[in-house]
Amino acid sequence: MFRDMGPLPSHQEEALVQITAAYLRDALPRGEYLAWVAEDKAMPPIIIGGAGVQLRSILPRPRPGEDDLELGPEAIVLNVYVEPTWRRRGVGEALMRAILDALAARGIRRIVLHASGDGRRLYERLGFVATNEMRLTPR
């Protein structure tokens, strides 16, 4: 996935794997990170896509146009990836619909993501809208 997004320096690959594995060993059992995979049912089955959600606590806030406050965690959709040969075949949409259903079942009403150019149309079809979010990456 990260190679497809741009250059991943070879010296960072092993560290990325190790640190991510350590994070997931801690976050998955606590329910802080939720994960989905899509499989090809060939024998043996192979993973053809995946996606994750990180839950984070945020302060209560007003909901524009609503009478109640927005409470509870915010879901950040991360690492949505489909193997290139499986793209444009509904795998990404199936992953996202599974995520949205699971989050709705948990009562999570605020979901954010950072859309790639390739994924933007899918997210818009699912009801996501562009916002005014900005980012600073201090050096």
Model-derived features with residue positions:
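Conserved GNAT acetyl-CoA-binding A-motif
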Residues: 96, 103-115
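Active-site rim helix/loop that mediates acceptor-substrate recognition in acyltransferases
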Residues: 12-41, 58
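Helix-loop element at the rim of GNAT/NAT acetyltransferase active sites that forms part
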Residues: 1-11
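Conserved acyl-donor/pantetheine-binding loop and adjacent beta-alpha core of acyl/acetyltransferases
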Residues: 43-79, 87
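Conserved catalytic-core motifs of GNAT/GCN5-like acyltransferases
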Residues: 58-64, 112-118, 124, 129-139
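Conserved acetyl-CoA pyrophosphate-binding loop and the N-cap/start of the following alpha-helix
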Residues: 86, 90-98
